[in-house]
Amino acid sequence: MSRVGRVERTTKETSVLVEIDLDGSGKVDVSTGVGFYDHMLDQLGRHGLFDLTVKTEGDLHIDSHHTIEDTALALGAAFKQALGDKVGIYRFGNCTVPLDESLAQVTVDLSGRPYLVHTEPENMAPMIGEYDTTMTRHILESFVAQAQIALHVHVPYGRNAHHIVECQFKALARALRYASERDPRAAGILPSTKGAL
């Protein structure tokens, strides 16, 4: 059974198309107009082994906020759609990823209950190119709200802002991959004692 999610979201601020195949091979085609964000979404697809298409046109003449936020909302909704009934998945996933001096620890529960815990070093550089580093948390908040997952992201240390953000996306990719993969020992079983996720 195909596990593909496709979401189109159009407002006066943005036009977004996201398609994700959870059982892909890491093929990525991303264009948001925000170079560093494209780079992070590329990490998400490649390290999650998700086939990921993202096409966003936004009001970048103002700034990148709406473009980044609406893309994350659509991505979360597409991920939830692709998960389907969640029967037979592992449900939980975690991964720790270093990037030189930075380290990210990510744990996810595909629980149906949106919750985010996010910590990263203070006093990060405010910008990476056109990317506002305060948007990383907002991306995760937006994704979690629509995907309806519990997500814990912890960066205990790091100096370079690029590395701090990138290791979060890489660890998130792997954690989502592990949680969403099918468990051969649990075929046909919903991973919940209450019978619903």
UniProtKB/Swiss-Prot annotation:
Domain of life from the UniProt record: Bacteria
Enzyme Commission code(s) on record: 4.2.1.19
Chain ranges passing through the membrane: none
Assigned protein family: Belongs to the imidazoleglycerol-phosphate dehydratase family.
Main localisation: cytoplasm
UniProt-listed GO biological process terms: L-histidine biosynthetic process
Major enzyme class: lyase
Pathway: Amino-acid biosynthesis; L-histidine biosynthesis; L-histidine from 5-phospho-alpha-D-ribose 1-diphosphate: step 6/9
Descriptive protein name: Imidazoleglycerol-phosphate dehydratase
A Pfam entry, by short name: IGPD
Reactions it catalyzes: D-erythro-1-(imidazol-4-yl)glycerol 3-phosphate = 3-(imidazol-4-yl)-2-oxopropyl phosphate + H2O
rRNA-binding found in the keyword field: no
Keywords: Amino-acid biosynthesis, Cytoplasm, Histidine biosynthesis, Lyase
Cellular component aspect of the GO annotation: cytoplasm
CDD domains per UniProt: IGPD (cd07914)
Protein localization: Cytoplasm
GO MF, one annotated term: imidazoleglycerol-phosphate dehydratase activity
PROSITE patterns: IGP_DEHYDRATASE_1, IGP_DEHYDRATASE_2
